Amino acid sequence: MSSAPNASALMKIGQLKKPYGIKGWLWVFSETDDRTAIFDIKPWWMKTATGMKPLTVKAWREQGTGIVAQFEQIPDRNVAETMNGVTLWVEQDILPEPAEDEYYWSDLVSLRVMNEQDEYLGDITEMFETGAHAIMRVAATTDSLDKEERLIPWHKQTVVKVDLTEKTVLVAWPSDY
């Protein structure tokens, strides 16, 4: 068994959801572009109250509009019931470099968001998918324009420029939205 990696070297790739059936299967929410691509990335780590623990997929399949999986560490539904909400992580250095103008969500979290009027709207605290497109949750800071939380679509018409070196995202998003 490999030793637990440093948490700062990890990237979140998904989350376990409610149990499916009686044999320890769980619904899996994937944060990968192709939701089944999550199963091509190994090894997985799960974040628990006692630290990072390995999680090994025994089997998986598409089920309706989602995906379910069975794990070596989860023998039955009773254990599966305790796993709802557990986050899934991989070591970032095993992932390929993103293509030009593509980003891993974990690289975007904590970036400062500025609009075209040069107003500081806040920092990205979360990226999530709605089905139509990804959304940036932008939280106010002590230095931001106001105390409003904003949900800004991650879309080519909205995101003007990303500068990972300067840790900023420029958006076409007026402050009164």
Curated annotation (Swiss-Prot):
Gene3D superfamilies found in the cross-reference section: PRC-barrel domain, RimM
One Pfam short name: RimM
GO-annotated biological processes: ribosomal small subunit biogenesis; rRNA processing
Subcellular location: Cytoplasm
Stored InterPro entries: PRC_barrel-like_sf, PRC_RimM, RimM, RimM_N, RimM_N_sf, Transl_B-barrel_sf
Keywords for the protein's UniProt record, in alphabetical order: Chaperone, Cytoplasm, Ribosome biogenesis, rRNA processing
Record's keyword annotation contains Chaperone: yes
Gene Ontology terms for molecular function: ribosome binding
GO cellular component: cytoplasm; ribosome
UniProt domain PRC barrel: residue ranges: 100-177
Subunit structure and binding partners: Binds ribosomal protein uS19.
Main function: An accessory protein needed during the final step in the assembly of 30S ribosomal subunit, possibly for assembly of the head region. Essential for efficient processing of 16S rRNA. May be needed both before and after RbfA during the maturation of 16S rRNA. It has affinity for free ribosomal 30S subunits but not for 70S ribosomes.
Family under the similarity heading: Belongs to the RimM family.
Domain-related comment: The PRC barrel domain binds ribosomal protein uS19.
Protein name: Ribosome maturation factor RimM
Source organism of the structure: Psychrobacter cryohalolentis (strain ATCC BAA-1226 / DSM 17306 / VKM B-2378 / K5)
Top-level taxonomy: Bacteria, Pseudomonadati, Pseudomonadota, Gammaproteobacteria, Moraxellales
